[in-house]
Amino acid sequence: MNEQSITISVVTPTYNRLARLQRVLAALAAQTYSPDRFEVVIVSDGSTDGTADYCQQVQMPFRLNFIQQANAGPAAARNRGVAAARGALVLFLDDDVVPAPNLIAEHLRLHEERANRVVLGTMLTPPDACLSPWVAWEQAMLEKQYRAMTSGVWPATARQFYTGNTSLARQLVMAAGGFDERFRRAEDIELAYRLNKLGVEFIFAPQAAGYHYAERSFASWLVTPYIYGRNDIIFGREQQIDLIGFVRREFGQRNRLTRWLVWVLLDRGRSSATALAVMSQLALLMHRVLGEQSSRPIYSAIFNLRYYQGVADELGGRDRFFGPETTITATQA
């Protein structure tokens, strides 16, 4: 294969998800875009499940570059993949996101229309997926964002830069300094803020579809919003962005249940833990008896409570989070 013919590099970090990775690779082999024109860079982040043996032996119609590293997190793995990429464009695709046949072609079409773009594809719920209730909630919230962007309720921004399915010029990643390897979660959003300062255009691409075979434990799901909350404050502080102002305004727009729960339970460790345990069991019961949609408001409340606790902890406590206007809004809920 002539390396000069490669126009786009698919970069996929992976960690002990061989079965899912095999499905992703099979879908990449079935792309409508010529396999001579793209490569796939797999970065194993310390996998111990046979990923290395499989990737080193499998034959694919495209160039497959396999890289093994000690476990260092997804940011480090993506940086390693970008460094090895030969294409002028980089497409980040997670190891549990199965691409539709035209995914690569659709990303490329939008880049050909205009340079300096970040193309944001979708991570849709697969019709054959059996998701945990909290993961089903997460997917529902993601697809709610997609509908909002499609209908013009809001434009695509740095906050929708999810590296499960997104593409941009390799030189833009390098110019922004790559992923910050200190962060194990939301490292994609942090990079997006730096990309935004370079004047890139974020564009939503609903036709660049991927199917997200998501799986995570409830304990992992519960930790995620807390880290997001802390990271939002860290990102704002380090990049001199008024994210706390954004977070407070967003809080004021939350529903009454969420605002009341946060007002009552923020920084109340024992009470908060009890409430989370009760809400978790109630959500499972409602999901089982009444169906997935009935549990969504409860999972939203759990997620938001954990997120705002992360915000408050990074700020130094609830008093630092609740400004006068926020206090009034919460007590009126």
Give the location of each predicted region:
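A conserved acidic beta->alpha catalytic loop
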Residues: A27, P35, S44-D53, N71, ...
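Short aromatic/hydrophobic "clamp" motif used to bind/position activated sugar donors
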Residues: V90
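Conserved donor NDP-sugar-binding/catalytic core segment of glycosyltransferases
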Residues: N102-V135, Y213
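A recurrent flexible, glycine/aromatic-enriched loop bordering the glycosyltransferase active site
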Residues: A148-Q171, R184, E190
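Non-catalytic, C-terminal membrane-associated alpha-helical segments of glycosyltransferases
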Residues: I227, G245-A333
